[in-house]
Amino acid sequence: MVLEVKNLSFKYSQKLILDKLSFSVPKNSITSILAPNGSGKTTLLKCLLGLLKPLEETEIKACNKDILPLKPYEKAKLIAYIPQVEYYAFNFSVLDFVLMGKATHLNLFAMPKAKHIKEATSVLERLDLESLKDQGINDLSGGQRQMVLLARSLLQRTPLLLLDEPTSALDLKNQALFFDAIKDEMKKRELSVLVNIHDPNLVARHSTHVVMLKDKKLFLQASTPIAMTSHNLSALYDTPLEAIWHDNKLVVYAL
């Protein structure tokens, strides 16, 4: 397993948000987190990254390493992260922003070399972003920034990628391009993905595994075909839902 989580609990102002979650992310998989609104999906990702401190009984291992005591630059060698759309304090050019993905591969104060710039440009081309390379990151649309964040994460070349609602600002074309780029990368090297996503249809189309959360706890973990059933989805969302598979594609609708 690339990621192993045991007994993850988190409190905010004495209010329990996550209660003893235990789950894992297999190698070369896309594992989706599916849960009702307000279930702590983003909080979970921030706990995994060390941006929030879980309770003491929590154990988190990435690539068999206990990541809770690791320093930020050590975690950055294991985990890349794409947050929900945000602005940045400095309006870096897109190319310079993407090159930051190479920071963990360089010595302190070292500048990117020509090979790194070539690699960054190649990633931008793959994602149809080359024309934006000289623009400021804050001058882009939300969807464009998400694609640039993906480019930076791919350049980081970590074994684990965490995504928080990565397609919420993307149109249908770029949703497909986003996940196709990840799947292409998975064919080239070992890469596992944990993604917080709200659309069951996207989960079914792109995920190999699903983690469902409900009432602060783990509700279900299974492979996508086993998890994404009418019974499980209706129980998860407390509303009657019909899930129909056809040609390996899922359609979910309310009854």
Curated annotation (Swiss-Prot):
InterPro entries: AAA+_ATPase, ABC_transporter-like_ATP-bd, ABC_transporter-like_CS, Metal_Ion_Import_ABC, P-loop_NTPase. GO terms for biological process: iron ion transport. ATP binds at A35, P36, N37, G38, S39, G40, K41, T42. Keywords: ATP-binding, Cell inner membrane, Cell membrane, Ion transport, Iron, Iron transport, Membrane, Nucleotide-binding, Transport. Its main location: membrane. Part of a binding-protein-dependent transport system for an iron chelatin. Probably responsible for energy coupling to the transport system (Potential). This is Probable iron chelatin transport ATP-binding protein HP_0888.
